[in-house]
Amino acid sequence: MIVYSFPTLYEEIVKARINRFTVVTESEKICHLHDPGRLKELIYPGNKILIRNVNGKRKTNCQVTAAWSGKEWVVTDSSIHNEIARRFLPSDAKSEVTVGKSRIDFAFDNTYVEVKGCTLARDGIALFPDAPTKRGKRHLDELIELRRNGYSVLLMILVFRTDVVCFSPNFDTDRDFSNTFIKALKEGVNVEVKVFQLDKENIVYKGEIPVCHQILEKSTNFSLP
């Protein structure tokens, strides 16, 4: 199932990532990178990327859309995450709902949904985050509190590569987030991990993968009921 389509994409080579949100290509294009993660395995000098032309108020007129993993193109544009997630939610779901000190991505009926995008994989395991995220931990804390108050809550993780068989929080990068993820599972927060593949200009939904229960049990002595 195609869930998103880009305009024409152009292949470039990374010359430098001059800050978190700006990439310079070997052809001297200056492109916006809409992903706050480290992306060290994807955005580095000499690697291939796909860009698209954009018009707007930014100083850049192109946007990094995907990067080559060595096996496939991995989408690196977090600006489209919620649009993709909405394809799996009721049409009347409300966006950007304020809860406590945070904004939760979606709400409908008695359900709250937070969306996270994942681009990192190691040994067949999808990992999030690839950089410490206090904001991500805060979102999990809000989901836990909502669950305790009787709401249905869902953490929807969008994985933009297919070389994965299960998902785990990235303990090596952010133990606080990872421990809170475990806590969320214990509290009854639902987790859906959806896998996508870039096929030419189209993002295609490939199905779901489970949370890596065996890895979590080994890392934290946590076992699911």
From Swiss-Prot:
Highest taxon listed in the record's lineage: Archaea
Coiled-coil boundaries: none
Molecular function terms from GO: DNA binding
CDD domains listed in its UniProt record: SfsA-like
Family: Belongs to the SfsA family.
Listed name of the protein: Sugar fermentation stimulation protein homolog
Organism from which the protein derives: Sulfurisphaera tokodaii (strain DSM 16993 / JCM 10545 / NBRC 100140 / 7) (Sulfolobus tokodaii)
Gene name, Swiss-Prot/TrEMBL: sfsA
